[in-house]
Curated annotation (Swiss-Prot):
The gene is rplD. It comes from Legionella pneumophila (strain Corby). Part of the 50S ribosomal subunit. NCBIfam families: rplD_bact. Belongs to the universal ribosomal protein uL4 family. This is Large ribosomal subunit protein uL4. It holds the Pfam family Ribosomal_L4. HAMAP family: Ribosomal_uL4_B (MF_01328_B). It comes from the Bacteria.
Amino acid sequence: MEITTIDTKSKLKLNKEIFAYTYNEGLVHQAVVTFMNNARSGNSAQKTRSEVSGGGKKPWNQKGTGRARAGTIRSPLWRSGGVTFASKKRDYSQKLNKKMYKRALRSIISELCRTGNLVVVSDFQCDNHKTKDFLKKMNQMEISNALIIMSEVGENEYLGSRNLIDYDICDVTTIDPVSLLRFEKVVVTEAAIKKIEEQLQ
């Protein structure tokens, strides 16, 4: 299996086991859900009437005042009272076996390859850290929305792209299913292709 680099027009041989893998929609969905759930902090929490400070003494007598009866100033009906159905901290993390995760990444990368959304370049380097120059480089390739995968992310490439919503840049060790699916194109360098093959083997 071969792919042509868009800059030098040279042929690059690809591993069929990685770039021509059968698409498994169920596994990809599971990997995406697991990744997104593991990113959740789960810190949302409120206090119930039993946890709010104060409220031990009955505010006024049960009878004789003409007011509605009240047993505590920390009732959920009161200002500064507890929350009726208070949410608590919870752990949203899920487990996905390494083999399953690798197969999900193979499925996504192979589908990108089949649909023509995987773009290979011989190298990707910016002369400086300016966003304007980074955009100019992407416009020359006629790519308006992309994830760029490099073997190692340089400082100029990182600084030039970090303020842009339509582009993201990462190295091979930090690729994830959500980023691979979020962008229209995935631009990969030749050096990164070799590392991806080693990592997903």
